[in-house]
Amino acid sequence: GAGDQGIMFGYACNETREYMPATLILSHVILKELAVIRREGQVMTYLRPDAKSQVTIEYDEQTHRPLRVHTIVVSTQHDEFILPGDGLTEKEAEERMQAAIREDVRTILIPRVKARLERAGDKLAGLIGDDYILHVNPTGKFVIGGPHGDTGLTGRKIIVDTYGGRGAHGGGAFSGKDSSLSLIHISEPT
């Protein structure tokens, strides 16, 4: 088969206990906490399973150490919980819905992410201040998600599924793979 060749990249860094980039770990924690909130069903009850996140960190130019979270992007699938009608146009309903999601991400999700990191004794919690830029569903309403929203196995999200923008990537996607074929090889530098 086609599993006899490929370019694989991998690296470790000392930004986190997991030896992965802080941006990636923070994105993962955001998505894990978002899933917990959705499963609890107490707040943000409009949440649906499809979501993605990106975190940008400002680094010290001399030491290359993380200074602070600069930007957080959260795109999350949701119900249409505010509908047009009763004097609301479709545009007004969508704007109110997006404003409510944005407010909930800022006041519910991000504080819970920070608390989760603090409980774990993770130094990444200290990077999340109050001065970050927040983008929530920046492309607008996100009602259709999952396979219906991203049809086809075209290798979407290969960078976000690995190291983010911090490392090289061989180009292979994780979707649509024969599970017997190699996806990741780890080798020590020569």
Locate the predicted segments by residue.
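Active-site pocket-shaping loop/turn-to-helix segments
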Residues: 176-183
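Short capping/connector residues at structural and topological boundaries
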Residues: 12-16, 147-149, 158, 179
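Alpha-helix capping/termination and helix-coil
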Residues: 113, 164-167, 187
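A glycine-rich, aromatic-flanked flexible loop/lid motif
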Residues: 149-175
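Residue-level detector of conserved catalytic or cofactor/ligand-binding positions
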Residues: 184-190
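Glycine-rich, mobile lid/loop segments that gate access to catalytic sites or pores
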Residues: 1-144
